[in-house]
Amino acid sequence: MEFFNYLRDGFEENVIWKEENGKIHFEVFQGSKKATGVADIEKVTIEAKVAQTETLNIGFMRRLMERNFSLRYSRFALDPDNNISIRFDTYVLDGSPYKLYYALKELTTNADKLDDILIDEFRMLKPVDTVHLVDLPMKEKEVKYNYVINQLNAALASMNSG
């Protein structure tokens, strides 16, 4: 449980866990993605759904296979519902806190980064597991957009004036 306390951000409530029937069920939120996991006396399993597809395409499947070679702890997989997910599992005997931390970091950051990239590039992919996301009001989006534009213009003006 101390591991989850270490990961938890009190303001964001990014880690939720409960103990039930000798198992720990947990969710970790990173950006737009949610990783769910189960830990018991023998094994730890974590999964984050990245996107959903109705048809398999050689383009995105090759991209994911290539990515698998660069991952150290996790791997991309396709579940029975045609969800592309990134998974990690280990036996408790091999699961040091160091390994769990870096595996969870690798899994969540890759899921959060790649969902938008893959969905944008491959039109047959659809977003999945996004019910926890809250859309910002249009007024707030405008304020943030205008702020970014003003900062970019100020930076460009500063560069141009030397």
What does each model-identified segment do?
Residues 100-115:
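Short amphipathic C-terminal alpha-helix that caps PH/PH-like domains
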Residues 78-83, 87-102:
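Well-ordered alpha/beta subsegment
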Residues 1-8, 40, 79-84, 125-135:
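Generic N-terminal leader/targeting and pre-domain segments
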Residues 1-4, 57-61, 100:
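Generic alpha-helical secondary structure
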Residues 1-53:
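N-terminal catalytic cores of peptidoglycan-degrading enzymes
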Residues 90, 97-99, 117-125:
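Charged interaction segments
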Residues 119-162:
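Charged, amphipathic alpha-helical linkers/stalks
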Residues 47-83:
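Short, internal acidic amphipathic alpha-helical interface segments
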